[in-house]
Curated annotation (Swiss-Prot):
It comes from the Eukaryota. The keyword Heme does not apply. This is Salivary endonuclease. Its cofactor is Mg(2+). GO terms for cellular component: extracellular region; mitochondrial inner membrane; nucleus. It comes from Culex quinquefasciatus (Southern house mosquito). Keywords: Endonuclease, Glycoprotein, Hydrolase, Magnesium, Nuclease, Secreted, Signal. Saliva (at protein level). Female salivary gland. The keyword Signal applies. Its EC number is 3.1.-.-. Glycans are attached at residue 285.
Length: 364
């Protein structure tokens, strides 16, 4: 038996040498080394789409062209394993985050679909995610983004960034979100900028900057939006689920429902930036709808439900571990939450028709 292993050992060593040689002939940069807003936007070879990291790093073969945006400039490097490292991707300026109107309705006649992404000189625009905006009230309807667990590699969240204004000229988005402007009767409760596409889901630090737009947030009670609230908890659970299933790419839809019979606005005088009564999230993969979640925005609680059967658990307690994947707090101030399969919505589906049509193309 030992002579057999001795006889093949040269072959094994040769194969090992080839593997090592192939690995040494590639360029790799960990996304954990790109934790600065003044880092590049790395592109695919088409130079018009974002390159997705794998297992927390970018990789190129020796001699392969590396395309990236630095500030507003499109640049190119050639993969040379001895010379490519994170320092080669330092930029003087951060990426230019902007939106592009793609001229498509998404929730009624007053709605417009926008792509959020990064702009470079020469008219180049690289899209990242898509959002639906209600132009008459300057309010968000819903947002769609991709989530791939294998992309991540220890990238922390951004510090609280200034949100970028959106497409309603003259509207003082930032002012209306201040506590002084809101004048809430109980100072414990006030509206925050509720992310729809959370920056946590963006694997690359510079990509996170694109989520800080007023086109991607709605007024949300602080006790629901902050850590310990059910919307924050839902974002966290979806993110962890994606990391535990790293080979599956998810498409996430995040949106809100407004009350047409009792409209409330953050900008009261202008009747802009509508305050939602529900938040919703749909998690899908390439062929199936995993679940649809609803989080109430009523601090006094609600008996309304959109699901025939609640497939979430509502016995989460602060400071204790839970074995359930989808477990939430049963407290109105944190946002009463229920969830179900897409088919469980039956005739009660409250989502925009355009979203329903897109999701119905998947197998449920």
């Amino acid at each position: 038996m030992s002579s057999f292993f001795l006889s093949i050992s040269p072959l094994v060593l040769a194969l090992f040498h080839v593997v090592v040689q192939v690995c040494s002939q590639s360029c790799q940069v960990a996304i954990s080394e790109l934790q600065s807003e003044r880092k590049v936007i790395i592109l695919n070879s088409d130079k018009r789409s974002l390159k997705q990291p794998s297992n927390g790093k970018y990789s190129w073969k020796s001699g392969e062209s590396i395309y990236f945006i630095c500030g507003k400039d499109l640049k190119t490097l050639t993969c040379s394993p001895s010379s490519i490292n994170a320092k080669r991707f330092d930029c003087v300026k951060p990426p230019d985050v902007t939106e592009r109107d793609i001229n498509r309705e998404c929730n009624g006649k007053s709605s417009k679909t926008f792509q959020m992404g990064f702009r470079a000189s020469g008219g180049l625009f690289v899209p990242y995610y898509e959002l639906c905006y209600l132009m008459d009230t300057c309010s968000v309807s819903h947002v769609k983004h991709r989530l791939l667990g294998a992309s991540f590699g220890g990238v922390s969240g951004t510090r609280e960034k200034s949100f970028q204004s959106f497409v309603c000229p003259g509207l003082r988005y930032n002012t209306h979100y201040t506590q002084a402007s809101q004048k809430q009767p109980d100072p414990r409760f006030y509206f925050q900028r509720g992310h729809l596409f959370p920056d946590r889901d963006a694997p690359v630090f510079a990509w996170k900057l694109a989520t800080y737009s007023y086109g991607n947030c709605v007024p949300q009670w602080n006790t629901i939006n902050s850590e310990g609230g059910n919307w924050w908890t839902l974002e966290y659970l979806v993110f962890k689920y994606a990391q535990q299933t790293p080979n599956t790419e998810y498409t996430i839809y995040d949106g809100v429902l407004y009350d047409p019979r009792n409209k409330q606005y953050l900008a009261k005088q202008e009747k802009k930036i509508e305050i939602p009564v529900w938040f919703w999230k749909v998690v899908t993969n390439q062929t199936h709808v995993l679940k649809v979640f609803f989080v109430s925005h009523n601090l006094k609680g609600t008996k309304q439900t959109f699901c025939n059967t609640n497939r979430c658990v509502n016995d989460r307690a602060k400071g204790t571990k839970t074995v359930e994947t989808w477990d939430f707090y049963n407290e109105a101030s944190r946002g009463i939450t229920h969830c179900c399969y897409w088919k469980d919505l039956a005739r009660k589906n409250p989502l925009p028709i355009e979203v329903q049509r897109e999701i119905n193309n998947k197998k449920n």
